[in-house]
């Protein structure tokens, strides 16, 4: 699908792709929360990464988080847990602090989840550098979407932003292979941050390199997402996805729609608590359903709804909602709080 290589079309593409990336058919959390099932489960199968991007904890604070890879037998237990949710989880997304392709068994993880239909859709976010002839065919036939984060347009730019030497031409060839073998169901989403395409020439090169390969191509603003992390790139691009000023968010939407399964089984209410401060359960000893409907989640949601987000970490210093989310529960907080209390009272009575 050939796209014109000019700034006007680039802007139009972004407006179109944002509907795919954020799903314009979104559930109104203000009217629906608390939900019976999480909409999204983030699956962190490893915390290892082959890059050290200058805006990431892997570069800024590499000694402040545990390195590890998820056990496959534990993953199968988690998948069994997912099947207990009614309605079914909308999306299982392989992502996390590490790059999923660093897990040598990642194709087995994906195949098992897809074969057992533990969610409605399956996605992976990756830098794509470890795509190869062995994993490309499997991922291309199982995933509903592969999201590739591009960090530069040549070897030198990758070194500038990720502190790693790569073979950019080989990387592009593997993306081309994936694009050719994937089925129609699978979308290849290629995105790059605006710091890497900060001129018209670079924007045109980005489209020239990847528009024919991608079903979706997107330039996103480079913003800070990690609590307590200060990048040396001066991340001041406004909102990650939309052209709108930052606004303070009192109630985090993430804790009403998602959970992350960390590599060691700890369950987090979101995907950016890289220091593992806000643990809501442990899937080694608890079911995901019990965690989702448990007292710890109720207390966390209640604190936010009561305007207490800034009284505890990492929520107090988290920039995710202001910089990256488009859902907002602030104006519906009182109504949601009443429904949360009703839900958990019913659970206690049952």
Predicted features, each with a name:
Residues 131-134, 199-200, 268:
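Short, well-ordered alpha-helical microsegments
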Residues 55, 254, 317:
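Short, cysteine/histidine-rich loop/knuckle motifs that typically chelate Zn2+
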Residues 173-176, 180-188, 210-250, 266-268, ...:
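C-terminal accessory region of radical SAM enzymes
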Residues 85-95, 114-115, 120-123, 142-152, ...:
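Conserved C-terminal portion of the radical SAM core fold
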Residues 48, 52, 251, 314:
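The −1 position to Zn-ligating cysteines in a subset of zinc-ribbon hairpins
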Residues 35, 249-253:
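Short loop/turn motifs at secondary-structure junctions and domain boundaries
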Residues 41-45, 49-50, 71, 99, ...:
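Generic structural signal for small/hydrophobic residues in well-ordered secondary structure
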Residues 2-145, 157-161, 165, 169, ...:
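Conserved alpha-helical substructure of the radical SAM core
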């Amino acid at each position: 699908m050939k796209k014109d290589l000019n700034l006007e079309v680039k802007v139009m593409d972004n407006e179109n792709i944002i509907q795919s990336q954020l799903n314009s058919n979104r559930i109104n959390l203000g009217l629906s929360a608390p939900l019976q099932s999480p909409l999204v489960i983030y699956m962190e199968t490893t915390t290892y990464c082959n890059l050290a991007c200058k805006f990431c904890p892997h570069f800024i604070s590499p000694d402040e988080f545990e390195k590890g890879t998820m056990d496959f037998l534990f993953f199968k237990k988690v998948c069994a847990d997912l099947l207990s949710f009614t309605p079914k989880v909308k999306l299982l997304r392989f992502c996390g602090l590490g790059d999923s392709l660093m897990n040598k068994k990642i194709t087995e993880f994906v195949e098992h989840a897809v074969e057992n239909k533990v969610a409605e859709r399956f996605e992976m976010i990756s830098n794509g550098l470890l795509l190869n002839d062995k994993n490309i065919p499997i991922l291309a036939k199982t995933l509903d979407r592969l999201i590739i984060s591009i960090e530069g347009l040549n070897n030198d730019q990758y070194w500038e932003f990720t502190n790693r030497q790569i073979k950019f031409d080989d990387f592009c060839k593997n993306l081309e292979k994936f694009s050719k073998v994937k089925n129609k169901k699978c979308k290849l989403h290629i995105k790059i941050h605006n710091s890497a395409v900060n001129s018209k020439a670079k924007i045109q090169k980005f489209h020239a390199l990847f528009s024919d390969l991608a079903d979706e191509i997107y330039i996103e603003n480079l913003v800070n997402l990690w609590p307590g992390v200060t990048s040396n790139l001066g991340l001041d691009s406004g909102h990650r996805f939309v052209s709108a000023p930052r606004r303070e968010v009192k109630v985090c939407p993430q804790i009403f729609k998602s959970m992350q399964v960390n590599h060691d089984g700890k369950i987090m209410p979101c995907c950016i608590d890289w220091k593992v401060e806000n643990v809501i359960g442990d899937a080694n000893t608890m079911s995901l359903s019990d965690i989702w409907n448990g007292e710890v989640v109720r207390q966390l949601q209640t604190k936010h709804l009561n305007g207490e987000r800034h009284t505890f970490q990492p929520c107090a210093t988290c920039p995710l909602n202001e910089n990256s989310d488009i859902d907002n529960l602030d104006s519906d907080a009182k109504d949601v709080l009443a429904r949360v209390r009703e839900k958990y009272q019913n659970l206690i009575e049952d």
